[in-house]
Amino acid sequence: MRTILGMAVFAMGMCGCSASVDKPAAADLQRAQAARPSDPQLAERYERSCMACHAVAASGAPLTGFTPHWQRRLAQGMDQMVRHAAEGLNAMPARGQCNDCSPDDLRALTRFMSAGATP
């Protein structure tokens, strides 16, 4: 019985350690909060419609520039990610509440936020 209990405690500890891989560090959060697209019009749209979720770790949205949050999504392909941005998915509202974003804007913003991540 003690052996089983010890193994269970060890397993829970290991799970706790591995879960932190997807948790952004303070530097990741600072980078997400400071990042802006180089295009001024796109930067304005990002600040207005994307940052409230994608620069806040507790929002549940993938953090801008944080590779572990984007790899699984990028594996689905950019077209699928842009479709999810346009139509909405789970807590993501349709168009990210950027009603004046064109399809090209949505693609550019998605590419910007997922930059650095590779499938």
Give the label of every model feature segment.
Residues 55-83:
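Gly/Gly-Pro-rich "capping" loops immediately C-terminal to redox-active cysteine motifs
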Residues 61, 84-117:
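Axial heme c-ligation environment in periplasmic c-type cytochrome domains
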Residues 1-7:
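Bacterial N-terminal signal peptides that target proteins for export
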Residues 22-45, 59-68:
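Electrostatic cytochrome c docking/interface patches
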Residues 46-56, 109, 113:
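The canonical Cys-X-X-Cys-His
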